[in-house]
Amino acid sequence: MLDRRDFLRLSALASLGTLAGCATTPAAARIRPITRGPKFHWRGYYDKFLFSADDRFVLANEVDFEGRSPTKADSIRVGMVDTQDGDRWIDLGGSNAWNWQQGCMLQWVPGSDRHVAWNDREDGQFVTRVLDVKSNRTRTLPHPFYTFSPDGKTAFAPDFARLDVTRPGYGYATGAERDIWKLKPAPDDTGIWRMDMATGQQRLLFT
């Protein structure tokens, strides 16, 4: 039977052998930056579809400042990087509805190899932009989105203005005072919304 000292010695030798084996294993992938300064680039949340179906294009947000929270006047650019053409930046549009945590929800629409969606602001209201990257045509839907159904036909979203007060950093700035105690508790006219991506029709699911 091994005593404690022998057990620790053998365990240490086994660990060294494992590390030695790792040291001789060649790297399986090469990592490189695909965006360049002087502007700042980031992607947003990890659950978004950022790679095109063929893995050639990668979506990203672009902004010219950092170190402070965005205001309702701040805008960003959205684009995609062509990884097969010297990581060339392709500008797709802009957004005035975004935050540092999640950007403007920029992503490929599930099930599509040509449609990209993001949130924006128009006439004081949050909206969804849907761009066909092959025809360069853009549709605007009258409400924002947070996530899509797996088939990309339905979108779901919270109240981003209310979220900016209840969870600063995750909603979109409106200029309103961020005082949670001044909000109406559990209002009947807002909550989690469902939107038809074909028609833009919206329905309140939960309050």
Region spans (language model):
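N-terminal export signals
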Residues: 6-24
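Beta-strand-rich domains and repeat architectures in extracellular enzymes and scaffolds
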Residues: 34-73
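Surface-exposed loop and turn segments in beta-propeller and other repeat-based domains
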Residues: 35-40, 93-99, 202-207
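Blade-loop segments of beta-propeller domains
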Residues: 45, 73-116
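Beta-propeller blade signature
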Residues: 76-83, 130-132, 189-197
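Asp-box/WD-like beta-propeller blade repeats and closely related beta-sheet repeat scaffolds
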Residues: 103-105, 119-191, 206-207
